[in-house]
């Protein structure tokens, strides 16, 4: 009986890992034992950073909204509170885009938020 080596399977497995390691420096892309560690670590970073990306973009949007709102005389929290009271349901991504690309439209939203805050303040008094 001939010896079974699994050569085809092993070659395919090595090729898959080395293809994923393409572009790594030095032996990290050519040595299978090293490449498998680097590829695993790279996949861990990718998994982690797909989640971090969401947090980073949300904080970027909040910074942009805050800057746009402060130009109009409101803080971020006052602006968001005013939008909620006015019944305007725009997410932070859209608001940040408006603040950067359409300052006039964003200014009208700030005006509506201010008006909603003023009416609730009058009702409370």
Curated annotation (Swiss-Prot):
PROSITE patterns: RIBOSOMAL_L20. Transmembrane segments: none annotated. One of its GO terms (biological process) is ribosomal large subunit assembly. One of its GO terms (molecular function) is rRNA binding. SUPFAM superfamilies: Ribosomal protein L20. Keywords: Ribonucleoprotein, Ribosomal protein, RNA-binding, rRNA-binding. One of its GO terms (cellular component) is ribonucleoprotein complex. Binds directly to 23S ribosomal RNA and is necessary for the in vitro assembly process of the 50S ribosomal subunit. It is not involved in the protein synthesizing functions of that subunit. Belongs to the bacterial ribosomal protein bL20 family. This is Large ribosomal subunit protein bL20. The gene is rplT.
């Amino acid at each position: 009986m001939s010896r079974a080596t699994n050569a085809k399977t092993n070659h395919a497995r090595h090729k898959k890992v080395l293809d994923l390691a393409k572009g790594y420096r030095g032996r990290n892309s050519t040595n299978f034992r090293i490449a498998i560690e680097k590829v695993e670590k790279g996949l861990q970073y990718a998994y982690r950073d797909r989640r971090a990306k969401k947090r980073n973009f949300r904080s970027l949007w909040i910074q942009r909204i805050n800057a746009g709102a402060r130009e109009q005389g409101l803080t971020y929290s006052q602006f968001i509170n005013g939008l909620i009271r006015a019944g305007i349901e725009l997410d932070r991504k859209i608001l940040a885009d408006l603040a950067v690309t359409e300052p006039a439209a964003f200014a009208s939203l700030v005006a509506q938020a201010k008006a909603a805050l003023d009416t609730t303040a009058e009702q409370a008094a």
